[in-house]
Amino acid sequence: MTRGSMKRSVLFVETDAAAEYPYANNNLISMYVRCSSLEQARKVFDKMPQRNIVTLFGLSAVFEYVSMGSSLHSQIIKLGSFQMIFFMPLNEIASSVVELTRKCVSITVLKRARQIHALVLTAGAGAATESPYANNNLISMYVRCGSLEQARKVFDKMPHRNVVSYNALYSAYSRNPDFASYAFPLTTHMAFEYVKPNSSTFTSLVQVCAVLEDVLMGSSLNSQIIKLGYSDNVVVQTSVLGMYSSCGDLESARRIFDCVNNRDAVAWNTMIVGSLKNDKIEDGLMFFRNMLMSGVDPTQFTYSIVLNGCSKLGSYSLGKLIHARIIVSDSLADLPLDNALLDMYCSCGDMREAFYVFGRIHNPNLVSWNSIISGCSENGFGEQAMLMYRRLLRMSTPRPDEYTFSAAISATAEPERFVHGKLLHGQVTKLGYERSVFVGTTLLSMYFKNREAESAQKVFDVMKERDVVLWTEMIVGHSRLGNSELAVQFFIEMYREKNRSDGFSLSSVIGACSDMAMLRQGEVFHCLAIRTGFDCVMSVCGALVDMYGKNGKYETAETIFSLASNPDLKCWNSMLGAYSQHGMVEKALSFFEQILENGFMPDAVTYLSLLAACSHRGSTLQGKFLWNQMKEQGIKAGFKHYSCMVNLVSKAGLVDEALELIEQSPPGNNQAELWRTLLSACVNTRNLQIGLYAAEQILKLDPEDTATHILLSNLYAVNGRWEDVAEMRRKIRGLASSKDPGLSWIEVNNNNTQVFSSGDQSNPEVVSQAQDELNRLKRNMLCKSSFNKLVCSN
């Protein structure tokens, strides 16, 4: 305010007519205080014919401009502006303190709250703070400002405490997990001071138990609630419901819920949230149906949590019905509800409807943007994901966070967008998210999918905090690239750093042992799975069955499978694969019947194992029947399915059918393997025409393939074309000089795996260990041969 305008205001207020109104004088005092003219404010105050409590509140504006310890603050005390408090009734003094404290409502005004508290004390209003009413509001003021330590100090200095005093702290502790453990020691003081708890007391204490996940203390409180007659209080019972749900005791929660007479929306919501939190999604949706049948109207929060359940369950039809009900019921959609709808459509793969919902959101927040970007990425719309990410960058707010980058990076994992992923990696580094575990895991997945293990290792090395998800990504990534030995090493290193393994990491490392035929190392991980209780997890069970099956111990695989309580299809497929690998066609087919009897729909893996079994045994008719059955069920055949069928009909000499299958197979470099199988069959059947055509197709893909030249030489030989045989032999000799040596590995000395090649003398220790193992195998063979001779001679 300028000097001129202030003078005009003073001239008006100092008229006799204006002086009769306290309202005018109160505003004049407030104006002088804001302009730091405290002496003028005191003069107006002294001349006031009528003073009320608002006069004091006008002076309280000084706290917005004057800090503790300043000269102006000292001047206030010197002028005695607050001495009027001594001439006010006690109830008005308490009310004035309360009104001042209620102006402090967040942590941003904590300094002002302390100034109010100190100024009231130093101005002589200490008598007011002896009132529990004033002190309780001081406690609430500090709680609202986020200073629970200061609130406790006020509580401890109170000469008289009542139930409201205790409830103020209980409520604060129940909302702050770091302070929740301080609540129960207070109950001893409460009992000592003969303060009787009420419904609010029990509600807050039960919420503390939920925060601490202390179901025993919660049950004890529930007994007191029943004893003191609060079991009919809906608010108290709802808090007990929430406590049991948070602690995972859904049976006790259901018993309490059944005893609640007047169930409101909060009680129903608590049961729905508890079911979803404990992965009982179907039960949560059933509670929602019962809620509707009971006539209780769902709230926006109800719709949001139920839609989240539909997202987790992938229940698209139910999600659509809930969306329709929201529209019909004229419920005013808020941002959390819109985000829940958006997440549901993204999770269920309906991106068209997801974009419609996103477009109707008036002011989408970062959760909205992250949901639409993640939905595009997860549903194969990588280009749209990047477009939405660029749109977000063009906006001033909100700014992308680690979840945004993770979703965008996932969209660039495909080879055609990999270059964008590298650019995003640069942005992540620039903005300081490179050490985020969430972003790091996505970067690892992107690099491994593009076969850049070294780049993935660099990302991993930057991470300071490595959780089990990050380690598992390294294990799975190396396993998929065929680096099974590295996968095992990473698991061992993870375990040494005291990271707890989970079912996914164990199943991945057991799969790596299976690929490398490292049975002894796999048995060690089997023991670890039993010790940690993950042997009951279906992914681990399937990996164990697969490992023992591939290593020739199908009986052990059968034992593990029989111990599984509710094996899933993956576990069934693993056992079926064990029978297939050993050519047990009859057992495989019988096991297939059991799969059908148990209500499972066979998938591509199921039929692959069956076709492989038929291929091993040469069961052509059975294989053709299964092939046609698979196609009738709409299961798309992959390369391995075609490989089994080509091998099967080629062994039977049906080269024309094999040629037809190859031409139907998906194109790619893998087709060379199919053509090579056909070429080998043509050698056996002396079919020169199809054989030459097969060789031509292989050499288009790999002109220097030695195996093809050898097969082609054999084809010429069986057809008597010796000049062509000689020509092929000359080519083979030229190719042999540039051929890369094959590698082998052997497991020796307690799970130590050594890699070597033919004639390799580079590592004497490896040569010695391999030679010792070879000698051991020879001795075993000689002993077995001698035993057989002894048995036969007898």
UniProtKB/Swiss-Prot annotation:
Region (Type E motif): 674-749
Organism domain of life: Eukaryota
Region (Type E(+) motif): 751-782
One GO term of the biological process aspect: RNA modification
PROSITE patterns attached to this UniProt entry: PPR (PS51375)
Position of the signal peptide: none
InterPro entries for the chain: E_motif, Pentatricopeptide_rpt, PPR_At4g14850-like_plant, TPR-like_helical_dom_sf
UniProt-listed Gene3D superfamilies: Tetratricopeptide repeat domain
UniProt repeat feature PPR, residue ranges: 131-165, 166-197, 198-232, 233-263, 264-298, 299-333, 334-364, 365-399, 401-435, 436-470, 471-501, 502-536, 537-567, 568-602, 603-637, 638-672
GO molecular function, one term: RNA binding
SUPFAM superfamilies in the cross-refs: TPR-like
UniProt keyword annotations, A-Z: Repeat
Family: Belongs to the PPR family. PCMP-E subfamily.
Name of the protein described by the UniProt record: Pentatricopeptide repeat-containing protein At3g50420
Species of provenance: Arabidopsis thaliana
